[in-house]
Amino acid sequence: MLLRFPQPYDFELSTGRFRDYRSDRATVWHDGALYRVVAGQEVRVSAADGGVEIEPWGEAAAGEIGRLLGLPFDLETFRGGVSDPTLRSIVESLPGLRPTLNPQPFEALVVAITTQQISLHAAASIRGNLVERYGVRHEHAWEFPTRERIRELRPRHFTPLGFSRAKAEYVLELAHSDLEFDALALVDDEEVIAAVTSVRGLGRWTADWFLARHLARPHAWPAGDLGVRKAVSRFYAAGGSLSIEEVRRMSERFAPFENLSAQFLLAGARMAG
């Protein structure tokens, strides 16, 4: 059944990161389609006129896939409101791009932990090992390990998967924490940051990306992310290297669309090579 998207929407362009990181086992690109397990059932997502085709259809599948593919973003208002000429040029060059999200909060934070201080490809690889070992396999994709499943583990279970001792402990701290994910969706950005950073191993960078890539908060600006710093430096510092604080101050330039601005700057940097 068709899940409609505001047009223009380019499925191939918007899902490029899933093809780039094929070691991701929770959201799998295979033979022109995405596969993800939703509520215990594998769902196939493919391009269709006016949106995407979801098989099998269900309310849970439509909700999760819509969030995965960035439906919460108000791109029409963003595209019409971009005033910065450099960013506007990037946005106009990518008319069908809709940034993606991670629809599950626990998974989103584990993803953030795995990407700390290593390349995205290396992070995807060790995360894939975790999902294969402790998730539930379906035909193409694996169901991401639940918080309850991770609580059963010890640091020694993570070492063969490529995790450092510290990252293993951070994932376990998260699993055993008092964070109430549903409640985080209902509070303001500063409260989310305070709650996330109260867990050992989760700092401001992790909180910013959680706001940006899970909650789709419009003002999220992950200045501490190396990719964002490189993208901002590329387009606004003539290839020089801006500091975290310099990048953080630049968020005012893109208000009130900081999150989508960061996503499009990253996309522009990737497209430019």
What residues fall within each predicted segment?
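HhH-family (HhH-GPD) DNA N-glycosylase catalytic core used in base-excision repair
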Residues: 1-273
